[in-house]
Amino acid sequence: MGQKVHPRGFRLGLSADWQAKWFNEKNYKEWLLEDEEIRKIIKNKYYHAGISEIYIERPDAERVNITVKTARPGIIIGRKGAEITSLREELEKRFNRRMVINIEEIKTPELDAQLVAESIASRIEKRASYKVAMKRAIMNAMRKGAQGIKVMVAGRLGGAEIARREWYLRGRLPLQKIKAIIDYGTAVAWTKYGTIGVKVWIYKGDADI
């Protein structure tokens, strides 16, 4: 049976970066759980902001640097920065640490695998055809310059009695090539027939390593 490796974990330190940039042997468990809670709070509060990734750095025990990659920075920043100030104060009060929040705009969300997966899942939840949603995502990604894209959905597709999976591939997707820049994202669509999983791989070219 073939063994599969996570596309991001396979390339960490080369064409992919760590989402948590810190190490502390003494407080490792506490900080790891904090990181997950911080990500959950931000993702849930700004679900419609198109958040792809949240990077967390800890220069010392009292400060946390958070970088949010989003397709709609205005939703998180708010008018005159009111929303981001409110978020920072909420996190500082909850975790009793100084929070520094940076926002990075995603210029081409069509090439962000996580946002593409969430977009497909959202369309499926709204009872759109999963085939149309998949093909539209592929077409948009290729139009924006992707060298390859694969989209897979699994579950009771179209309300079928038996769960199955379907996938579409356009272009190239060299998963075993370490210097290949491959973005990977997953999402879940909640339907009345159960959950439908969505996975997206986008090949953007090769890194200079």
Swiss-Prot record:
InterPro entries noted in UniProt: KH_dom, KH_dom-like_a/b, KH_dom_type_2, KH_sf_prok-type, Ribosomal_S3_C_sf, Ribosomal_uS3_bac-typ, Ribosomal_uS3_C, Ribosomal_uS3_CS
Single GO biological process annotation from the record: translation
Record's subunit section: Part of the 30S ribosomal subunit. Forms a tight complex with proteins S10 and S14.
Cited Gene3D superfamilies: 3.30.300.20, Ribosomal protein S3, C-terminal domain
Family to which this protein belongs: Belongs to the universal ribosomal protein uS3 family.
HAMAP family membership: Ribosomal_uS3_B
Protein name: Small ribosomal subunit protein uS3
Pfam families per UniProt: KH_2 (PF07650), Ribosomal_S3_C (PF00189)
Transmembrane segments: none
